[in-house]
């Protein structure tokens, strides 16, 4: 099925693919974290009404620019402000935590909101070395299991939803991540490599290729092929950066300001950061080893709504996709809200062009 987005303003329900949103709860210059989190609440309510399929919260540590270090806490709050939309993590940075505790958290959420909870996990640290050391202070790095081992343990806890047999309550296998929900959280592995794709397939999880972090078309092609081959033909999801504006020129201007950097210190795994300043801070905090950092290619889907939908549909057809997770890489509230409303098809609002003075009222209107 193909469509011509220029012929009409199709609702999200009429598209040949599903759209979800990734929210990093960005703190715009001059505002507080409380204001950024209030906007996340408003945007979730808006996404629920507009027909977006999922709303995911990202995890970031020790940064004044992003307001959410604990997706599971914000998820619980957002559930109380929505009715239909699935809400989840995009994702929990599993290297920092006990898989058992993560399973407990998301089993509790799934018990509170059956059929509405997503659990996405990722390999990244979600912060710079100082926060990583603080989060992992109770672990001996030499004895810390690898990511695949942690993910497999988490999977076991999520899959075990029956009570242990009578008389075995004190056995190691009797451990349960209570409460045991009737419908478990839907698990996703977020990654940008063939290795991650194969791990997701091995676990029986959905795989999300993080094109908002890794824009390499070759890596995308290989990961999609690997996941489809190892999972029995399942389609992955694609997380993609998207900016929608009233004109292609306006969207291109917003997209041109975005940048990413890849940084590595010594033999430690490379990480991706959002600015040169973050790359330099990472090098300072990591200490030891020869530092390297370089710009990463960014590929943002941008333009008018019709242009963006056509490009997403082309990606859908090329890779056999069914769903996208949209990252709007804008901190400023005005263009970010306008981009999401345009994407949802609210053309009259976008034509009005909200002014900076209207941002607070706009956020309140989103919640209604």
Which residue stretches match the model-derived regions?
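Conserved, mostly hydrophobic/aromatic
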Residues: 19, 47, 51, 59, ...
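A conserved active-site cap/scaffold subdomain adjacent to cofactor or substrate pockets
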Residues: 195-213
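Flexible, glycine-rich active-site loops centered on histidine and acidic residues
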Residues: 14-33, 95-162
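Hydrophobic faces of well-ordered beta-strands that scaffold small-molecule active sites
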Residues: 19-23, 55-57, 87-90, 117-121, ...
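Active-site mouth loops of central-metabolism enzymes
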Residues: 23-38, 92-100, 181-191, 296-305
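An alpha-helical appendage that flanks or caps ligand/catalytic pockets
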Residues: 2-13, 140-176, 218-319, 351-354, ...
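Acidic (Asp/Glu)-rich catalytic clusters
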Residues: 11-14, 48-49, 75-83, 110-117, ...
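N-terminal beta1-alpha1-beta2 module of alpha/beta enzyme domains
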Residues: 1-85, 366-367
